[in-house]
Amino acid sequence: MIREIIRMGDKRLLRVAPPVTNLGSAELHTLVADMFETMDAARGVGLAAPQIAVDLQLMVFGFDASERYPEAPAVPRTALANAQIEPLSEDMENGWEGCLSIPGLRAVIPRYRFIRYRGFAPDGSPIERDAEGFHARVVQHEYDNLVGRLYPSRIENFDTFGFEDVLSYDL
């Protein structure tokens, strides 16, 4: 089922979500399916549960090819509960980001280039992966959504913040 995506300005996006405690449950599997369906319908590359007004530390992400980010390499489709992120170096990389909760806008955001993320699959099995580049960016962006942070709070140069159909995408 496609869920409504709440937008910036809704205070529910600014809360720290509590951990998922019902790993392996039918309810969680249904929620994950709804999140993937919602993300795909919105042409997104990631979605956090708080974006559909579900107060849980749960994110989904991944794609083979993205209409919104055509240059991005594929990212494995993943449902990740109770995520933790560890930078693997201090290397930062600037890149364009948008958000399904902030439709029509984008900005250049600095993110760690190399990370390790950990958490749990919906069935309760552990997940631990190293990621770099756009994959790392997507995970960090969705993690921010779990801790009440939206990408505009990370903008360093507001000259790069604007509407998708107006911006020049030269970095």
Swiss-Prot record:
Keywords recorded for this protein, A-Z: Hydrolase, Iron, Metal-binding, Protein biosynthesis
Active site location: 142
InterPro entries: Peptide_deformylase, Peptide_deformylase_sf
Enzyme Commission number: 3.5.1.88
One Pfam match: Pep_deformylase
Record carries keyword Hydrolase: yes
GO biological process terms held by the UniProt record: co-translational protein modification; translation
Cross-referenced PANTHER family: PEPTIDE DEFORMYLASE (PTHR10458), PEPTIDE DEFORMYLASE 1 (PTHR10458:SF20)
Protein name: Peptide deformylase 1
Taxonomic source organism: Xanthomonas axonopodis pv. citri (strain 306)
